[in-house]
UniProtKB/Swiss-Prot annotation:
Tagged with keyword Ligase: no
Name of the protein in question: Capsid protein VP1
GO cellular component terms, A-Z: host cell cytoplasm; T=3 icosahedral viral capsid
Gene3D superfamilies xref list: 2.60.120.20
Amino acid sequence: MCSTCANVLKYYDWDPHFRLIINPNKFLPIGFCDNPLMCCYPDLLPEFGTVWDCDQSPLQIYLESILGDDEWASTHEAIDPSVPPMHWDSAGKIFQPHPGVLMHHLIGEVAKAWDPNLPLFRLEADDGSITTPEQGTAVGGVIAEPSAQMSTAADMASGKSVDSEWEAFFSFHTSVNWSTSETQGKILFKQSLGPLLNPYLEHLSKLYVAWSGSIEVRFSISGSGVFGGKLAAIVVPPGVDPVQSTSMLQYPHVLFDARQVEPVIFTIPDLRSTLYHVMSDTDTTSLVIMVYNDLINPYANDSNSSGCIVTVETKPGPDFKFHLLKPPGSVLTHGSIPSDLIPKSSSLWIGNRYWTDITDFVIRPFVFQANRHFDFNQETAGWSTPRFRPITITISEKNGSKLGIGVATDYIIPGIPDGWPDTTIADKLIPAGDYSITTGEGNDIKTAQAYDTAAVVKNTTNFRGMYICGSLQRAWGDKKISNTAFITTAIRDGNEIKPSNTIDMTKLAVYQDTHVEQEVQTSDDTLALLGYTGIGEEAIGSNRDRVVRISVLPEAGARGGNHPIFYKNSIKLGYVIRSIDVFNSQILHTSRQLSLNHYLLPPDSFAVYRIIDSNGSWFDIGIDSEGFSFVGVSDIGKLEFPLSASYMGIQLAKIRLASNIRSRMTKL
């Protein structure tokens, strides 16, 4: 031991006859370099400890170690560090490691005596008939093997993530329907390589900025031996958009049979030109499952189709790693996973057009709505926030007028009140009088029986098609009680209002007795939307020509055999004790989440949720990047509420959404 080391140890009241030796390079094991902290990564040395030259005086080293302690900075009391300096032979230096670094290294050395396979061992089943992680037919030869060199380079650049037991077993990702109606070339499954493929990777991805490596995918077919047919698993390189054509078979692919008993395992390789991918990178290798030969069931008939279910499970490949730890609270700019757009219980579902509970789904050729409808860019073509609260306006009228134009006082679009309803009247009206509801023969309807048994209900009310609002109407000098208000979007022409499916500040028609006399009176009006006067009309929001927009009306049609849906609820009618259906383009929670958060969803994909009713019937709802919802069946039928919803992942929009609900078939 050199004299300097011995003297330094005396200052620490340490026996200098003990030769304390350390090599901090062991804290940073790098395979290609024996001395990384002095050669390749000298900038990392301060993270592991403090270095002094042997020619420094013992007193100087002792004082600097005290002054560098956090306790000294706060109390100015000299505290001897818990770890004394040690001799770094190969460098000719004195090195004092940080206590936590030294303890971590010592525990790691002790842990080398443990069984290294113990933390990775997990038994999925003790029944030999049940598939365990090691079972399944691994398919190789046509797929690129993981690059060990790229993995090592990515580790050196950013640090390696911690190994865990979830790396050793397959986890459920999604399930895909394969029916006898699917023809050759039909894409059943397409997924780009990334953390979204695995639930554990998806969870851990929130802690990191980047990733790299392959993912293993296991497919299991739940059909029976009576089926015949083949699927092709195709590895599509980055930058190529899969098309539904057998031309895709020109890419590397393997085939597996519908009668395959053993699960089939594929590896999606990470083909990249950089050390790692950021979380927003979706231009990665894709795995596509395509129909190679049609599925055949000899016991099926012409009136319906049958099929089987392909279950998709995943686990990270041996080279998969996360990189660049993200501090808590940091927000990435690329967007988050759309896993919270639909509440788990239907008891929390209300419409974005009206605030009552969702009671059904309505499949239509086209779905359209502007107000309170949001897309994945956090944008809306409407004028309302995704919440329901009273509408606030002012009205100025004179000469006893009961018809006026409101002036917005709370808005996000200047001149249009937040929450103003988004349908117009059917034809020209002169609002006046009371309700007028008769049968087709002109008989007045006064009872529920007369209303329910009438073949035709004629609504000749002079304010039909307007919304009924509870009102808090205030004006200086007016001490009378507030009256019910009727509102709509329309063009005022004297005492007449005309339909208008575009809205601006001049079309906020309000029919209300605000106790106006001859002089101008300005009232402050707070309106709560409660009902509708369109007795005998079609559902609110079902007629495109009556749906109001500022300029553009967002609209969706069928995509890849999937049909757009409205979420149905109801609003109370005026006079008759009945309700009318309301069609909503989104659940209000979906609108709110899309307005507040930026989600990551490609334009050609769905965020898929599985809806299950109380009897076990289920179907998938896919939400596209425009915010519209789709289902893969033409008729949902009657569901037993309450329903539950669970996020299933991202699916290509051109693939039919799965369900166990059989569509109604008619044979001519």
